[in-house]
């Protein structure tokens, strides 16, 4: 019998891991706790005298200079994008994310450890349909030669291009169609990257304290410094897509639309999300039920790959 809706999801049990923060260098324990339908993803700083909850929503973004940082009442949670990408990529809607430090652990610099943690905990379907944010008209933002846009589509797709004047990176493009269930296989393992000259400057500023070749791709002027090289020939652009997925997930709902990104980063991704949210005519919130979706001209069965995720890790 065909399903009549795509329902919200949480974890089947509590799961946790430990790691260091990329910028703080602090040892942090991250714990994922199942949450009820409609709860959303909420970060909780448990290391404070009074725990502070910060919803994973665009309105709580307070910094995008080096990573995506959420904040509330003066309390911050940094580097949320890789975890958020894993949750979005594996269809998790409701979760309490506890941290005993200021930053989500960087792990290996990708989303794969978080995807594996989700897989180990198991996924539980809940008795409520997902709510989708359907893009209804084109929205774009520009910053110099950088640009990003969201346009109407039948499911979620990201087309990303980067262009660096560097012999190893240069120009790379990648197109991810969530209808093909490619996140775990094609994107989750792509690591963050940086230039050696920038890493040295950041460390002098007291940042990137937890950064190493174990959790980032580092390139000098001509080559990759990591002994094991790359996981994909185009790992750089794949990681940019991973970041974009994490940033766009701060809509608080799965997106139905096509994101096109050229030389974007966290700041421009967030600017795009905020611009969409500022104009209600740009989007529509729709329950992921067959009746409503087919009434909008969105093929219900065609969304299976984008919404009926399989918790698999390559």
UniProtKB/Swiss-Prot annotation:
GO annotation (BP), single: lipid A biosynthetic process
The enzyme's E.C. designation: 3.5.1.108
Alphabetical UniProt keywords: Hydrolase, Lipid A biosynthesis, Lipid biosynthesis, Lipid metabolism, Metal-binding, Zinc
Pathway assignment: Glycolipid biosynthesis; lipid IV(A) biosynthesis; lipid IV(A) from (3R)-3-hydroxytetradecanoyl-[acyl-carrier-protein] and UDP-N-acetyl-alpha-D-glucosamine: step 2/6
Catalysed reactions listed for this entry: a UDP-3-O-[(3R)-3-hydroxyacyl]-N-acetyl-alpha-D-glucosamine + H2O = a UDP-3-O-[(3R)-3-hydroxyacyl]-alpha-D-glucosamine + acetate
InterPro entries recorded: Ribosomal_Su5_D2-typ_SF, UDP-acyl_GlcNac_deAcase, UDP-acyl_GlcNac_deAcase_C, UDP-acyl_N-AcGlcN_deAcase_N
UniProt keyword Amino-acid biosynthesis present: no
Gene Ontology cellular-component terms listed: membrane
Domain of life (superkingdom): Bacteria
Entry keyword annotation includes Metal-binding: yes
Co-factor requirement: Zn(2+)
Active site per database record: 266 (proton donor)
Annotated Zn(2+) binding sites: 82, 239, 243
MF term (GO), any: UDP-3-O-acyl-N-acetylglucosamine deacetylase activity
Family annotation (PANTHER family): UDP-3-O-ACYL-N-ACETYLGLUCOSAMINE DEACETYLASE 1, MITOCHONDRIAL-RELATED
HAMAP family linked to this entry: LpxC (MF_00388)
Recorded family membership: Belongs to the LpxC family.
Function: Catalyzes the hydrolysis of UDP-3-O-myristoyl-N-acetylglucosamine to form UDP-3-O-myristoylglucosamine and acetate, the committed step in lipid A biosynthesis.
NCBIfam families reported in the protein's UniProt record: lpxC
Record-given protein name: UDP-3-O-acyl-N-acetylglucosamine deacetylase
Organism: Myxococcus xanthus (strain DK1622)
